[in-house]
Amino acid sequence: MDMREQKFGIEIELTGLTRKRAAEVIGKYLGQEPHYDGGYYEEYSVRDEQGRKWKVMYDSSIVAVKKGGDSAGDEYKVEFVSPICEYADIPTIQELVRQLRHAGAIAGENAGIHVHVNAAPYTARTLRNITNIMYCKEDLIYKALQVDVEREHRYCKKVEESFLQELNQKKPKSIEEVSNIWYRGRDGRNRHYHESRYHCLNLHSVFQKGTIEFRLFNSTTHAGKIKTYIQLCLAISAQALNQSSASPVSYTHLRAHETRH
């Protein structure tokens, strides 16, 4: 599969402006009026010409501040959520981020970006592939991206070696079997806030909503970086889907070597 054939979505945690203002900015760029949908997440939405919803939502984990740095109320906790996108939508995402930045949006303390890639093409084998690939690459990726230490330990933990080992020993044949290993025999797929989601490679998202979620990125309003983050996730996913297998043996070796140095 060409990485550009995959569908994806992105969630960007921001502050510096209110959700209402963010929705107005998105609506102006898309040429549509924002709609306040309300609910627990105090959601605003803007439909594009294709009828897709671009959302602005409340996220309790965001540290709310005004652009000048003064503390702010909950209305400044802004999560920008795209609809299901195709590769050709990346420039639109970039321009929306630019417009939000011009309106005062900033990447707050400990804020993150989550990229979701469509998991429909995945099998048990390719889920094992992507787990092994991430185990291999995540140390280098974390260093290159300068992932915030607090976020790493709290919201985007690295692949658990116990999960990796059991996955490779059992070589599950079905996604249901992968799910049993992920949840350690306890079915948590129907719980949106299951604690297992706080991993760089979040497979809870596969079982709960049908997407591979990458959670490691620090938030930013730099449109070029956001494009790179999306491309990185699509490339890793395409590698997992395209190669016949991925072994963790050399990866364990690499991680041990880096720890010693």
Predicted regions mapped to residue ranges:
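Aromatic/basic-lined ligand-recognition segments
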Residues: 55-58, 128-218
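Histidine-centered divalent-metal-coordination microenvironment in nucleic-acid enzymes
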Residues: 106-122, 211-215
